[in-house]
Amino acid sequence: MDKFTDLNYTLNVITLMNSTLHTILEDPGMAYFPYIASVLTVLFTLHKASIPTMKIALKTSKCSYKVVKYCTVTIFNTLLKLAGYKEQITTKDEIEKQMDRVVKEMRRQLEMIDRLTTREIEQVELLKRIHDKLMVQSTGEIDMRKEINQKNVKTLEEWESGRNPYEPKEVTAAM
């Protein structure tokens, strides 16, 4: 029975649209007929599509206000796109989501900057310690015997036979 009621309602709306269009067509100066016909078709389609959708959404949803708001915004955005506008209507929730996303990204960037700054400070401190260790300090006279590892080398007076044992000897070989 509901289907017949919807069918009668649809036929009545179509009849109303046809009579409106015939009234408009009687005016010979009407140049905007295709635009008006398109708008009326879109409005009728939106009307027929949105009412059952809204009924189902309101019955199944716990937060009906958000559903109505979302459907209304979607319908207006569709109409704006059909009219050729690039702008869209945004709800407060979408703006808050975008702001939360921006704030989250800023926090992530700040944490990264803090980590990088901490690393750079640690590197600078390490370089300072390395520089301090590499600084040349004058100690006055340096004992070169220890530097060239000659601690156990004996002087000429300390040799037993008085001659240098490291001097080359004359060697004769038998043939």
From Swiss-Prot:
Q: Which residues are glycosylated?
A: 8, 18
Binding-site residues for Ca(2+), renumbered to this chain:
120, 123
Q: Which family does it belong to?
A: Belongs to the rotavirus NSP4 family.
Q: Which HAMAP family match?
A: ROTA_NSP4
Positions in the Lumenal compartment:
1-28
Membrane topology recorded in Swiss-Prot or TrEMBL: Single-pass type III membrane protein
Protein's recorded name: Non-structural glycoprotein 4
Subcellular location, principal:
host cell
| Domain of life, per lineage | Viruses
Q: What does this protein do?
A: Plays an essential role in the virus replication cycle by acting as a viroporin. Creates a pore in the host endoplasmic reticulum and as a consequence releases Ca(2+) in the cytoplasm of infected cell. In turn, high levels of cytoplasmic calcium trigger membrane trafficking and transport of viral ER-associated proteins to viroplasms, sites of viral genome replication and immature particle assembly.
Kindly state the subunit structure of this protein: Homotetramer. Interacts with the immature particle in the viroplasm. Interacts with host CAV1, early and late in infection. Interacts with host integrin ITGA1/ITGB1 heterodimer. Interacts with host integrin ITGA2/ITGB1 heterodimer. Interaction with microtubules blocks trafficking to the Golgi apparatus.
**Domain statement:** Binds 1 calcium ion per tetramer.
Transmembrane stretches, start-end? 29-51
Q: Which residues lie on this side of the membrane: Cytoplasmic?
A: 52-175
In its record, the post-translational modification comment is: The N-glycosyl content is primarily Man(9)GlcNAc, with a small amount of Man(8)GlcNAc.
Q: What is its subcellular localisation?
A: Host rough endoplasmic reticulum membrane; Host membrane, Host caveola; Secreted
- Give a yes or no for keyword Zinc in this entry: no
Keywords assigned by UniProt, alphabetized: Activation of host autophagy by virus, Calcium, Enterotoxin, Glycoprotein, Host endoplasmic reticulum, Host membrane, Host-virus interaction, Ion channel, Ion transport, Membrane, Metal-binding, Secreted, Signal-anchor, Toxin, Transmembrane, Transmembrane helix, Transport, Viral ion channel, Virulence
- Asked if Calcium is a keyword of the record, the answer is yes
UniProt record, GO biological process: monoatomic ion transmembrane transport; symbiont-mediated activation of host autophagy; viral process
Q: Which GO terms describe its cellular component?
A: extracellular region; host caveola; host cell rough endoplasmic reticulum membrane; membrane
GO MF entry, a single one: toxin activity
